[in-house]
From Swiss-Prot:
This is Pyridoxine/pyridoxamine 5'-phosphate oxidase. Belongs to the pyridoxamine 5'-phosphate oxidase family. Pathway: Cofactor metabolism; pyridoxal 5'-phosphate salvage; pyridoxal 5'-phosphate from pyridoxamine 5'-phosphate: step 1/1; Cofactor metabolism; pyridoxal 5'-phosphate salvage; pyridoxal 5'-phosphate from pyridoxine 5'-phosphate: step 1/1. It is an enzyme of class 1 (oxidoreductase). Disulfide bonds: none annotated. FMN binds at residues 70-75, 85-86, 92, 114, 149-150, 195, 205. The lineage of its organism: Bacteria, Bacillati, Actinomycetota, Actinomycetes, Pseudonocardiales. Substrate binds at residues 16-19, 75, 132, 136, 140, 201-203.
Amino acid sequence: MSEANSTPTATLPSMRVSYEAGSLDEGSLAGTWHEQLALWFEQAVHDPSIHEANAMVLATADADGLPSSRTVLCKGFDARGVVFFTNYTSAKSHDLKVTRFAAATFPWLAMQRQVNVRGTVEKVSQEETAEYWAERPRGSQLGAWASPQSRVVSGRSALESTLNGIERRFADAEKVPVPPHWGGWRIVPESVEFWQGRPDRLHDRLRFRNNDGAWVVERLAP
């Protein structure tokens, strides 16, 4: 058998896991979506099998409806929504400016859980951006100045050359200022779904949905 014919993808149809790690019912659900997210997030943080519990897959679409997804880091959430930070000239930011919608998924696979957030987006305040910026390592701050995110570059050496220039520019600065092209986005949820894997694919799916300002909880078929 040739190497091409022995590809591991031949086993894909038979690859499956039985989900038996837990259950989720209406009676055990917290009173609000953000309280439930905080509960699950805390458990994910303390699960040694989960690395970067705040990683979430962010989905956007451009003006033509062409979708894109990428992993970003959640840097905060509360009753107002879920926050991440990025370059405001990036492809994702361009999508968000055009459509004003986004979806994000926390894939806590080791716990057989997902949380799916869908809604509109808004920029966070300059004060919120400055507060988070101050927490970033200096190297990350300099990198944010140096990277023309999502644009084609001639090679890594070009990025490193730009970074070297930025390092010289701020060499004598005690604090690196926030770039004018950088800041936070908040996903303001219209719905937040909590998914718990169950045996025989009869998964638990409980969704908080904003119904004209009043949140309702609904069970969805798996």
